Amino acid sequence: MFRTLLSSTVRSIQLKPVTSTLSTTIPSITSIPTVSYFSTSPINYKTNTSTRTKENVHDLTTFLTLIGRNSIEYKDLFEDDLNKFLSTTSAQMKNMGIDTRARRYLLRWRHKFLNDLEPLREHKLGKKRNGGERKAKTVIAKRQALERLEEKEKWAQEELEAEKRGERLF
């Protein structure tokens, strides 16, 4: 019964060939290149329009003042010479006695300055909350435990004072 119903339905459907203009515009598979190439077009960077750019900084004092973080204290190590600062390597800065955090900061700004990537400004140091990410849970737990202990001692002191006044009879 089902076969006859199905076969009669199939016979009644007339399939018509569909012609499309798309089939003529699609390239054949053999014409697609198998090797992908990198773009050789120049990358368009945002133009730096600030006054704190490479063209406006001519001495090391100005540079160190603009980048902030008390970098001006290293001015004497470079003899206040911008070219000496720009040619100094990380190993030489380490031998001069510049600590790691400040050295990395100076090197990062030197790279940005030479390539004119960003206006000179101070990148503020982040502030740790609750002792930093790794110790946050223990610091919060200790703080809450101390608060509970202080609250318990305060309550015990209030009860003792109330008992001395005669407000509590035990």
UniProtKB/Swiss-Prot annotation:
Pfam family of the protein (one): SAM_Ribosomal_mS41
Main subcellular location: mitochondrion
GO cellular component annotations of the record: mitochondrion; ribonucleoprotein complex; ribosome
Domain of life from the UniProt record: Eukaryota
Extent of the transit peptide: 1-20
Function per UniProt: Component of the mitochondrial ribosome (mitoribosome), a dedicated translation machinery responsible for the synthesis of mitochondrial genome-encoded proteins, including at least some of the essential transmembrane subunits of the mitochondrial respiratory chain. The mitoribosomes are attached to the mitochondrial inner membrane and translation products are cotranslationally integrated into the membrane. mS41 is involved in telomere length regulation.
Protein name: Small ribosomal subunit protein mS41
Lineage, uppermost ranks: Eukaryota, Fungi, Dikarya, Ascomycota, Saccharomycotina
